[in-house]
């Protein structure tokens, strides 16, 4: 196994300038959206590299979370609102928590006494 020679910060800064690289500061999270799910990377280190007129983003570190995307229609939200007697946001949240299951969302809202 070959060991890498440690690079001093001054050399690293010079190399980054030559490659037109810079680190983005203050990035809290990066979300990669796919058709059926999202990958959420919290507290990442994001580096922007410019090469041949294109920007490339390198994302490293941070904690990763993956969650499925649930498509909830306006009609479903309105139905839950009417049946459970709740506002829009409460109905939407209940549908998200139940994976879009109308009956389960209505039952949770009516059983918990939310008005």
From Swiss-Prot:
Keyword field contains Thylakoid: no
One MF annotation (Gene Ontology) recorded for this entry: RNA binding
SUPFAM superfamilies attached to this UniProt entry: UBA-like
UniProt-listed Gene3D superfamilies: DNA helicase RuvA subunit, C-terminal domain (1.10.8.10), Nascent polypeptide-associated complex domain (2.20.70.30)
Residue ranges annotated for the NAC-A/B domain, each copy included: 6-72
SMART domains, sorted: NAC (SM01407)
SUBUNIT field: Homodimer. Interacts with the ribosome. Binds ribosomal RNA.
Superkingdom to which the source organism belongs: Archaea
This protein's UniProt keywords: Protein transport, RNA-binding, Transport
Entry's Gene Ontology BP terms: protein transport
Family note: Belongs to the NAC-alpha family.
A Pfam family this chain is assigned to: UBA_HYPK
Primary role: Contacts the emerging nascent chain on the ribosome.
Gene encoding the protein: nac
Signal peptide boundaries: none
Annotated protein name in UniProt: Nascent polypeptide-associated complex protein
